[in-house]
């Protein structure tokens, strides 16, 4: 079975059209509260000194801010002149369809421009998954299943195209970074990883997994080159934001501040996880005492460290093969969402692409991916409630139902962990690869 490239291009274009159509329907308040004001601030005053001017709100790394500024600039230089031209035609040509002007002047238009980078990142992510799947299996049906499941995933579309969040930007860079490690293009991989970290800090959780890959697959010379190159990438991307009075360490100190300063202190910031299950979804700080001096924050951090260490130990024993990399990232990111405090509803998204890639090992994992997509989509909807649907809204506010789906998702984690530990040896992998679907 050959993959028809023209058909692939058709579906990619179709997924883009779908995303831009969805993006025009609505958007979350973050665009008005943060993204647009940041972009306007940059266009008015320039990049230099941005973090000092917006010290209380600016919690995104520079690459995303650059995207916001470019998107707003395109809105002003491309959209507004066309809008003025259409308005002129509407005023001076009696037969001109005025409804076209109303559509063009939709209040969501500027938000659609701001969502542009996220929308294209969705496609970049899907193509990265397609390339990795091609390394994992020769089964074209599985490869296409993975591609189409990424292109038309409702949770990803909801997050990027409707909500307007940027989580797929760092995720796309991460996926391609993993791909280039196994294509032995190590310096390209480190650049992409750095660009992902400079988009949003959420992929930082996989750094321990990447560190083992770095140690095994990079030669001594490449390790030195990669370290220097990483420092250069951070320095260059932060450079436009540096003011004259900033020192040479501005990029690294600012990023460290962004990674540690901001964030809620809630047990669960609307995430359907163990803390949401045990405690009320009300805003409860994670600093209260559970036992002695043990707080939920300390306990969750200990659990995350123990889980990550155990996964890394098995990962190392399994010789760091690509399949084990996918397993490890799936487990580390899913556990972080389910058991750490201060998680937002969006923080399960990094798990979905890697859980989807497990389908290239055995198609049974695809059903777990479908459930995780359903679970994540409901969690996103519960936090926003748009577009309004009383039945779905009532489901997401029903404690019994929500507790049930949380328990199922936690059980899914342990199912995947079980297969990772017991069945993910080299022999079992080779025997089980996509055996349920034949070319």
Positions of the model-derived regions?
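Perimembrane helix-loop-helix junctions
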Residues: 1, 183, 205-232, 242-246
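Aromatic/glycine/proline-enriched transmembrane-helix motif characteristic
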Residues: 15, 135, 247, 259-338, ...
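Transmembrane helical bundles and short interhelical boundary loops of multi-pass, membrane-embedded
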Residues: 23, 243, 252-263, 267, ...
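Membrane-interface alpha helices of multi-pass inner-membrane proteins
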Residues: 147, 157-158, 174-180, 187-212, ...
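Start-transfer (signal-anchor) and selected internal transmembrane alpha helices
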Residues: 1-21, 26, 134-135, 143-145, ...
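Extracytosolic helix-loop segments that constitute the early lumenal/periplasmic catalytic or substrate-binding loops
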Residues: 33-66, 70-87, 246-256
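Transmembrane-helix motifs of polytopic, lipid-linked glycan transferases
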Residues: 90-104, 108-137, 176, 306-315
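Specific aromatic-rich, kink-prone transmembrane helix
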Residues: 127-131, 156, 169-186, 354-355
